[in-house]
Amino acid sequence: MLLTFHGAARQVTGSMFLLETATGYKILIDCGADFNDKQNRKPLLHFPFEPSQLDLVLLTHAHIDHSGNIPQLIRAGYEGQVLCSSPTADLSALLLKDNQLLRAAKNDKEFAMAMVNRALDRFVAVKASHDFKVNEEVTIHFVPTGHLLGACNVLITLKEDGEEKTILFSGDVGRKNYPLLMDPVKSPVSPDYLICESTYGARLHQEKTAPEDILEKVINETCIVHRGRLIIPAFSIGRTQTLIYTLRRMQLQGRIPNIKIFTDSPMSMNGSYVYEKHLPWLDEEAKQMYKNGGTLFDFDNMVYIKTYKETKAISHYYEPCIIISSSGMIAGGRVNEHVRENLNNPFCTILMIGYSAEGTVGNELMQGKPYITMKKRDIKVEAKIMYTDMFSGHTDQQGLMEFVGQFDKQKLKKIFLVHGEPESMEAFKDKLSQEGYHDIVMPEKGEEFEL
């Protein structure tokens, strides 16, 4: 079989891998948008392969850096199905529509929606943790990974010349004991080949404190002591639900002061409905909370913002408050409005809770730049910028080592590191080598391997 790396090669975003069997059956694993530079944030117009010749697309999870170019793929001639877990199908309907509207020109909005709806018609939900026989040659198995609702590793078993070969695509590897979501599930078999993400391959999560303790400290300092506002940039799907759930849990424990919490992300409301629809994918505490209260994401002091007029009105709310708004990297969305209005406010704290790609405002803030350019205006940063990785859906180096550690070293013929910056990959590769793993590759974009 032939494996080609068309994305997430020596970078974090743009996951797209093409697997071709000995008989010529072609499977694309993920078809993500590339956010590494401003040019590549545009929809992909030309693929490095012929979409009409693909036989199958497998989607690890709904995040746009894994799914964002599926509508373009179908527009370019792909006629097959997109297989994924049931929650991934539901979340993709929200994320793809939102992404296409953001990327489309004003006069192309209607066409963009038609293109997304056409793509969504191809989605087929496959039961996770069960073998799914595609044909006599190919069997797939979705393994829940705890990164996002519905996120999975994809295990592919191929029968070639009377022999079985197994190849596992990690997707994004989640964390144990992450709020709201079930823990990652172990693969039913040890693969011959592993394609493994390495987002945090060079580091350990800094915080060992519980998420509630971190939030309590920041909220107390910002909203009680300084009577200011706390802005938390968060992706509408995933991080926002985790934050709201954590804040609700804190409210039930009496740990949140009586202040307004604005969730300014209309899509997050729909995302929350999807989470409550798929309760089996949540952890036991979340299931019990839903059973007791009938909701996970609605509580006293929570205000959901729907219109842009309401977004603007928040700037005239002068009491202490918490604002949760997307996007998490401050790379578009309503959070830009809140950040722009409050960068020079010394009583404001902006709490970054995850990775921000180069070229985004979030990345510049985390680098400590004294001035940020937004809407062609240089703004002095007087707000307090804080960072925690306790809400990151990605596991760290230790978690990645535990993930790889579940597999038989002797059976693993090759490990491909993807979805990480080069320095992260190098550090992870060195760690794997120290533990006795061999034949570890950091593929270049477009590089192909005969397996």
Regions found by a protein language model. Give the residues of each.
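Cap/insert and terminal regions of metallo-dependent hydrolase folds
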Residues: 176-264, 349-354, 372-435
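Pre-active-site segment of Zn-dependent metallo-hydrolases
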Residues: 9-14, 20-80, 84-90, 95-122, ...
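Core dinuclear metal-dependent hydrolase active-site scaffold
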Residues: 1-52, 125-182, 309-316, 322, ...
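Hard-cation-handling environments
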Residues: 218-358
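Short, flexible loop segments at boundaries between secondary-structure elements
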Residues: 265-270, 276, 350-365, 370-391, ...
